[in-house]
Amino acid sequence: MTNNLSGYRNKFVRVKTSKKRTVSSSNWLRRQLNDPYVAKARIDGFRSRAAYKLLEIHEKFKLFTPNMKVVDLGAAPGGWSQVASKLIKASDNNLNNKIISIDVLEIEHVAGVEFVQKDFFEADTEELIIQALDGRADIVMSDMASNTIGHKATDHIRTLLLCEQAFEFALKVLKPSGHFIAKIFRGGAENELLHKVKREFKTVKHFKPSSSRSESTEIYLVALNKK
């Protein structure tokens, strides 16, 4: 199971204070050093703890199968692309199994992944992804989130706007019965978006993976079977 953390817990690491380190950065470092999913990701070869979130989403909803075309929005550092590559059995030689990953930050190569280093919001980015797909996508997934500022309402709205943009793009490229996955932060303003998504997909669910930090308001919107 992806959430089997036996051997990764109960190894608390203290972080020494430093004049050069702010309180918030010290707290972040302490959380990273003591996060069992961070340790597990390092051992399992995943580039981020977020990989386990997608694995849990797949275990719950059975989204990925071989011979799929997948778009990964906001892919860096590549954890979700790694998971998708394994689940669809992607390779650099099989064009039927293809992942198009987009991020403004560079990511190291993943088997079966075509990486587009662009800002998703630039005018020509959508067309570049569509050309790279060479057809319709089976899954569009987005783990994009704005840089948080610690103000929950603002963080909620900013990430919701990213989700809305990803949703509008998904409608353009998904084939019928395709799936859409995206991160949102709970905060109340997401209801209008949910109504839009429900009009376009047969099944829409909310899911919070156990690998998502308990204090985080993030949840994942899982929209199944585009109409």
From Swiss-Prot:
Subcellular location: Cytoplasm
Catalytic activity: uridine(2552) in 23S rRNA + S-adenosyl-L-methionine = 2'-O-methyluridine(2552) in 23S rRNA + S-adenosyl-L-homocysteine + H(+)
Domain of life: Bacteria
UniProt-recorded Gene Ontology molecular function terms: rRNA (uridine-2'-O-)-methyltransferase activity
Keyword field contains Transferase: yes
Family annotation (InterPro entries): RNA_methyltr_RlmE, RNA_MeTrfase_FtsJ_dom, rRNA-MeTfrase_E, SAM-dependent_MTases_sf
Cited function: Specifically methylates the uridine in position 2552 of 23S rRNA at the 2'-O position of the ribose in the fully assembled 50S ribosomal subunit.
UniProt similarity note: Belongs to the class I-like SAM-binding methyltransferase superfamily. RNA methyltransferase RlmE family.
UniProt protein name: Ribosomal RNA large subunit methyltransferase E
Organism of this sequence: Rickettsia rickettsii (strain Sheila Smith)
Taxonomic lineage from the root: Bacteria, Pseudomonadati, Pseudomonadota, Alphaproteobacteria, Rickettsiales
